[in-house]
């Protein structure tokens, strides 16, 4: 996507942000007061359902407020941080607390992810608040809250590596539990799960030397590839797979190459070109990554032990076998 040619002047951005945040604060107050009133009146389940329907316009309004702040933030990046400190932060810090409705916590999480991702190291002062919240909400009952939380953990692991380092192991534990849940790949949970898989890969990439269970985390991560719901996550994880095969070979494939079949299956699925989970197909890897995969598969055809190659070959379906053989040099067979 090309950068916008028009940049909203900072003075105007300041005024817009002030007005938007004031309106967001009033919207949050209206919702919390309504929830408090409902609790005092002893609303039953049906009453709360009706109240939630009444909140739909407030939820849409708040989403628009958050999007507006996000657009302005991404325009000005680190220059926006003083405005963020003055207007969005005082409004959204309280909304990140557990007693708030999930939609408000989600709004707050999204805006703090944006500032950490786009406003430079000066924004990292919010990590001490945001990271514990993200870890807590990664297990939320609502999948959209989990998805935002694990995305935030991924962004923090890459953008704020020093501060994130103390959270590496507990975060990996949370993500592994999420990914391995029995219902993790059903339709309602797929996006949150794939974001968790992407987060595991990113953490292993940037913090691998500090992970004493890397030999367990990488195969778990790889077993959930390819990702198919979100193109950005799919392409990123495909790139990470190639990088790990080159730099963490034995950690990924196992000391006896016991995980080689998982790697071959993931790469051939990507090369076959699986469709995404939505209405439109997504590109699971960039052209360069696909080229790298073809080279890696050709190398594996000549370097893997025969038993590992045979096991990998037997695990493939017809389309995967066809694409695998098509990328090998003339005369080279993958099956020994």
Task: Report residues per predicted region.
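Karyopherin-beta/Importin-beta family HEAT-repeat alpha-solenoid scaffold
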Residues: 1-336
